[in-house]
Amino acid sequence: MAVNLTEKTAEQLPDIDGIALYTAQAGVKKPGHTDLTLIAVAAGSTVGAVFTTNRFCAAPVHIAKSHLFDEDGVRALVINTGNANAGTGAQGRIDALAVCAAAARQIGCKPNQVMPFSTGVILEPLPADKIIAALPKMQPAFWNEAARAIMTTDTVPKAASREGKVGDQHTVRATGIAKGSGMIHPNMATMLGFIATDAKVSQPVLQLMTQEIADETFNTITVDGDTSTNDSFVIIATGKNSQSEIDNIADPRYAQLKELLCSLALELAQAIVRDGEGATKFITVRVENAKTCDEARQAAYAAARSPLVKTAFFASDPNLGKRLAAIGYADVADLDTDLVEMYLDDILVAEHGGRAASYTEAQGQAVMSKDEITVRIKLHRGQAAATVYTCDLSHGYVSINADYRS
């Protein structure tokens, strides 16, 4: 059950000049499910991408990394769901390359101009023959249809759009889709994210922007603490809005475009948490007054990924000990626990090393019963802060994963 998340309509997701979308039923996932997506990219576009840090990364990740920086430029992204093509050895790479070659024939480019992406069951051979056979049968699609086609255990398609001024004269459009529900943890989580914009950005600058946006959005979420083998986040800049190229991070338009795309990416990232497997609550954990951003992030993740804390949220249990314990084992050097303050929404619940004198169990229960909760922790040792987004851990998470292959 997704937390305050609804499906976007095609009208809410405008087309991006220079991008064409296609989908098909390849039979990789389950019969009757659309499970294949192709994003065709206009010549002259630039692409930035970041990938999972899991050392067991999937075959398509290896291929996508090598094709990203090819001098010929990226002309297509092909995405299948139902099979991750991970843990498949050399044959997995052969299959991913075969899919690239077939997609290249379909749109009229070179195989090295196609980036492959897969998501689904690990340790199963990719049925490349099904994907190759389905490519000629693909039909034009809208963004909301593409968002549905890349889903695995997701319950709601995830898509968003933004429009805004970049520079004095040009309006920039951006639309993106993402998938993810379980195996969600930073660097990156089991998620795929694709954003297209009509802005014009040089490839090196777009690559840097993509990494920065990932760090500020998709790398601030956690559902279950597992880092997947297939995670990928891609930004495509088609350059079709007639503006001059952004080729330097000192260009004021860099910050303007990054802010616009960051807003879009954060909505997609939060949508993944809202649709976390079995989630019934959306939780924001913010740590303030840390010495460094890394320290703040470390403390926030300790609270956000703790199974004890997450199950307490599911149970609407205002027991504070689990939250304080999580901060205590976050390995923040020389932490003075007497200075730490913790809030549930705006209610002070802990200070001076223990329970706040003003706090009552009834206050905590009222907050914990909500479906959206903010936990704010003040360390009182500096000016740095970090925010992490998570969800509760319910019986539904166990059921979904127990039944995933059945």
Swiss-Prot record:
Recorded metabolic or biological pathway in which this protein acts = Amino-acid biosynthesis; L-arginine biosynthesis; L-ornithine and N-acetyl-L-glutamate from L-glutamate and N(2)-acetyl-L-ornithine (cyclic): step 1/1; Amino-acid biosynthesis; L-arginine biosynthesis; N(2)-acetyl-L-ornithine from L-glutamate: step 1/4
Q: Does Endoplasmic reticulum appear among the keywords?
A: no
Catalysis: reaction(s): N(2)-acetyl-L-ornithine + L-glutamate = N-acetyl-L-glutamate + L-ornithine; L-glutamate + acetyl-CoA = N-acetyl-L-glutamate + CoA + H(+)
| Pfam families for this protein | ArgJ
Please report any disulfide bonds recorded for this protein chain, giving both cysteine positions: none
For this protein, the record's SUPFAM superfamilies field holds: DmpA/ArgJ-like
Major site of localization recorded for this protein: cytoplasm
Give the enzyme class.
transferase
Entry's EC annotation:
2.3.1.35, 2.3.1.1
Q: Which GO terms describe its cellular component?
A: cytoplasm
Which compartments is it annotated to reside in? Cytoplasm
Q: According to UniProt, where does the site described as Involved in the stabilization of negative charge on the oxyanion by the formation of the oxyanion hole lie?
A: 119-120
Q: Which residues bind substrate?
A: 152, 179, 190, 277, 401, 406
**Listed GO MF terms:** glutamate N-acetyltransferase activity; L-glutamate N-acetyltransferase activity
Residue numbers marked as site, Cleavage: 189-190
Any one GO BP annotation for this protein: L-arginine biosynthetic process
Which residues catalyse the reaction? Answer: 190
Q: Which UniProt keywords apply?
A: Acyltransferase, Amino-acid biosynthesis, Arginine biosynthesis, Autocatalytic cleavage, Cytoplasm, Multifunctional enzyme, Transferase
User: What's the family?
Assistant: Belongs to the ArgJ family.
Assembly and binders: Heterotetramer of two alpha and two beta chains.
Q: What does this protein do?
A: Catalyzes two activities which are involved in the cyclic version of arginine biosynthesis: the synthesis of N-acetylglutamate from glutamate and acetyl-CoA as the acetyl donor, and of ornithine by transacetylation between N(2)-acetylornithine and glutamate.
The name under which this protein is listed is Arginine biosynthesis bifunctional protein ArgJ
Organism of provenance: Neisseria gonorrhoeae
Q: What is the lineage of its organism?
A: Bacteria, Pseudomonadati, Pseudomonadota, Betaproteobacteria, Neisseriales
Query: What gene codes for this chain?
Result: argJ
